[in-house]
C-alpha cells in the first residue's frame, strides 16, 4: 500500500527517487499531458456552466483521481515512489526544506521569476515548459510576493470545523467546506497557496511546477481529515443537479469513476498520520 508522507520527513534517497521519476515522466512527454488536462478543465469550468475540476463540489474527488493517475505514472517509473504532501500551514517560508536545491529548488530571481537552482531550474536542462501561454520556457516562481502569508493552522482548523460539505449554487459563491478549502470564500486556503508560489502555479498550467502535486496531496489529506471529523456529513449534491457532478455521476475526462468511488482514500493509499 502506498504511504504518502510529509515532505519534511523524506530521506535524501526518497527525495532523489521522487525527483528522478518526475524527470523521467517529463522526458517521455507524459508529464506534459497532465498539464494539458488540468488547463483544459481550468478553462472549461465556469460558475454558470458545466464545472468539474474546479469551483464545484467535485473539486476534491476530481483532484483525488487526477493525483492517483499521476502517482501511478510515477510508480510505473519507480515502484517505491509515493506522492509526498506539503503542509503549508507548518512549512510556511521560502526557507522550508522543500525549496532546497536537493528537492524542488527555490524561488525565482527578481528580474523574471526564473528558478535558478534545483533539478527543475532551466539551467539544468531537464525542465522545459512546453505547455505555456507565452514564450517563456523556464520554470518561474515568486514565493511570497503576490500574497505574503501562507494559510495558518488556525485558518485550516476553522475550515475543517465546517460540518456541511457543499451548498447551492455549487460554485465559487457557495458556502460550506469544499468552497472554503478550495479558497473562493473565507480564509482562502488552496487558491492562496497557488498565488503565494507564483509563476506557473498562479495559472491554469500550474502542474508545470512540481510543487503542484505536493500542494494538492495536502489538500487531499485535509479532505480526508474533514471526513474523519464529520462522519455524518457526506458528499453533496446527491442527485439531479444540473452542470455539476452528483455523488454517483461519472467524472470527465475518465468517465469511469464517480465521487462515490473516491470517498475512501485508504482503498488506494494511506497518509503517514492515518
Swiss-Prot record:
GO molecular function: metal ion binding; tyrosinase activity
Family: Belongs to the tyrosinase family.
Cofactor info, note text: Binds 2 copper ions per subunit.
Impact after mutating residue 194 to Q: Loss of activity
Required co-factors: Cu(2+)
Outcome reported for the amino acid change (mutating residue 190 to N): Loss of activity
Catalytic activity as recorded in UniProt: 2 L-dopa + O2 = 2 L-dopaquinone + 2 H2O; L-tyrosine + O2 = L-dopaquinone + H2O
Binding of Cu cation B, residues: 190, 194, 216
General function of this protein: This is a copper-containing oxidase that functions in the formation of pigments such as melanins and other polyphenolic compounds.
EC number: 1.14.18.1
Uppermost EC category: oxidoreductase
Protein name, UniProt field: Tyrosinase
Amino acid at each position: 500500500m502506498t504511504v504518502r508522507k510529509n515532505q519534511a520527513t523524506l530521506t535524501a534517497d526518497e527525495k532523489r527517487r521522487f525527483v528522478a521519476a518526475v524527470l523521467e515522466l517529463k522526458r517521455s512527454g507524459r508529464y506534459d499531458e497532465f498539464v494539458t488536462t488540468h488547463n483544459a478543465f481550468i478553462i472549461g469550468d465556469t460558475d454558470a456552466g458545466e464545472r468539474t475540476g474546479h469551483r464545484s463540489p467535485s473539486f476534491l474527488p476530481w483532484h483525488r483521481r487526477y493525483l492517483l493517475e499521476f502517482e501511478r505514472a510515477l510508480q510505473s517509473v519507480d515502484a517505491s515512489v509515493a506522492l509526498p504532501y506539503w503542509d503549508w500551514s507548518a512549512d510556511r517560508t521560502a526557507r522550508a526544506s522543500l525549496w532546497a536545491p536537493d528537492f524542488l529548488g527555490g524561488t525565482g530571481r527578481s528580474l523574471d521569476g526564473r528558478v535558478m537552482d534545483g533539478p527543475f531550474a532551466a539551467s539544468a536542462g531537464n525542465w522545459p515548459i512546453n505547455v505555456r501561454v507565452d514564450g517563456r520556457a523556464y520554470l518561474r516562481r515568486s514565493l511570497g510576493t503576490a500574497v505574503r502569508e501562507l494559510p495558518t493552522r488556525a485558518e485550516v482548523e476553522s475550515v475543517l470545523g465546517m460540518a456541511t460539505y457543499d451548498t447551492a449554487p455549487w460554485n465559487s459563491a457557495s458556502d460550506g467546506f469544499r468552497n472554503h478549502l478550495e479558497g473562493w470564500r473565507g480564509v482562502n486556503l488552496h487558491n492562496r497557496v497557488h498565488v503565494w508560489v507564483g509563476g506557473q502555479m498562479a495559472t491554469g498550467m500550474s502542474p508545470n511546477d512540481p510543487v503542484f502535486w505536493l500542494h494538492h496531496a495536502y489538500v487531499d489529506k485535509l479532505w480526508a481529515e474533514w471526513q474523519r471529523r464529520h462522519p455524518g456529513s457526506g458528499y453533496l449534491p446527491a442527485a439531479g443537479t444540473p452542470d455539476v457532478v452528483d455523488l454517483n455521476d461519472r467524472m470527465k475526462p475518465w468517465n469511469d469513476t464517480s465521487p462515490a468511488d473516491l470517498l475512501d482514500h485508504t482503498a488506494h493509499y494511506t497518509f503517514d498520520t492515518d
